[in-house]
Amino acid sequence: NGGTKPLRLNSFVGEILAVVEAEVSVDSVDQWDRPNLVVASDYSFKGMSPKSANRTAVWVEDPSFTSQVNYELKTPCVLECRPPLGPDAEIAPGGSFSTFRTFELVPDSTDRERKGMAVRRMYRALAPWATENPIFLHLTSIDPAVVRQAVDQCVAVGFEMIILSFGSGLNMEDTSPANIARLKELADYAHSKGIEIGGYSLLASRSIDAADDVINPRTGKPGGAIFGNSPCLGSRWGIDYFDRLRRFFEATGFDILEHDGSYPGDVCASTAHPGHRGLADSQWTQWAKISEFYQWCRARNIYLNVPDWYFLAGSNKTGIGYREVNWSLPRDRQIMLGRQNLYDGTWEKAPSMGWTFVPLVQYQGGGAAATLEPLAEHLDAYRAHLVQNFGYGVQACYRGPRLYDTDATRGLVTTWVGWYKKYRDILNSDIVHVRRPDGRDLDAVLHVNPGLREKGFLLIFNPTDAEIAKALRVPLYYTGLTDRARVREGEGPPRAFTLDREYGIALDVRVPANGFAWYVIE
């Protein structure tokens, strides 16, 4: 604002881009094909995928495009990027206003795999912190003895991080000297052993009180928010909440924040909250508040698990895509559904961008049939989770009070953590989706990375009760290999293959009942 009076910015359109229409139709249709353009923004929330979290990119008609085929001139061929509400920001004389950022990717294909790879590559470039992929335990207690044992077990098996989970008793909002001292002592112990430690804080989906909750513009009262009730981040409580979390992290040295709910985009009609004037600026100011906090965390290398699409604002990881109630099903169903989640959740997310779940103890229900404890009695199921999660390169919330209970369990976990770490670079690389898990036949994925010695890593699962032997076609185009490939099963000797005209090979595989096989491609 170069003037002498304050300016009020009611709304803005940050991007206007006219493109060639994706669909030509004389008649108007209910769902038009959209142009093949990927639009990302840091103003994204209430979603665990780019599509569901999009709040700014809108395709609109272009009435000046009078030569289009559609009789009503309704072809959506102009991209506009704008906030859904506001910002209704006041710009003081000499001041400035920064909009959200929009990033556009023009894919060279509509092929789902190739386009997905381009999206993953874009996020690796724009949010490199999303490539961090530590192995962590979701610890269910803050009892000092339990925490110290968990630290020691992490060291013993190769885990790298502990998150004091929901239900553990952790309260980051308590900045009393006693609470700070107790948790700093635990953090110091973890750090002395080379283990990072942090914890869980609930933000959305809770009610504080009528003065601090978001106010429904239709009723003038709390309630009716996206998750029922939520505090307004511009309320006195909301402002104090972030101040308390900052003090907590600075005083304890905690390394991780698992921020449940985050800010999902709730609007607030209150005119009494100090952080916003009214409804029109409530969404913008709340988003700015949480984005500023995440950037503060990012600057201090605080790892952020956020079940929302806040990557471009600083978060490291979101959910891979699952329904929590499914972790209360019997163990065998969890394994199959978990692998489907992994397969489906890695089209637009790199393996490091999503977390999955393993209920070592009961989560929401299901009793003994749904849990792995006692661990020593369910080694097959424990191994299945470890292999498929590490094999996909996706970390899980291993939720419980411990990682092992016997030497045999310890050996199992140590073996598969070591396997993952040996092949970590290729297992964290892009996934080519070979066959989706369906419980009826082999399912498989292929990690690819032309820049590594291991150009590919093929992981095959057999969910049936009988051994399966067959020729599996393996697409190797994205490995960067053009003529020949050396393939070895496990740590066995390599075999030479000549690639066909489609850059693939036919691999004879034999996978045991309810088992798996893996191959390294060089």
Q: Which residues make up each language-model segment?
A:
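Alpha-helix-loop-beta-strand connector modules within alpha/beta enzyme cores
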Residues: 183-195, 282-302
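Active-site groove signature of glycoside hydrolases
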Residues: 160-167, 242-275
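The substrate-binding groove and active-site-proximal loops of carbohydrate-active enzymes
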Residues: 133-144, 165-180, 223-242, 274-286, ...
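C-terminal beta-strand-rich structural cap/linker in extracellular carbohydrate-active enzymes
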Residues: 498-522
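Active-site-proximal substrate-binding groove within the catalytic cores of carbohydrate-active enzymes
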Residues: 290-493, 508-510
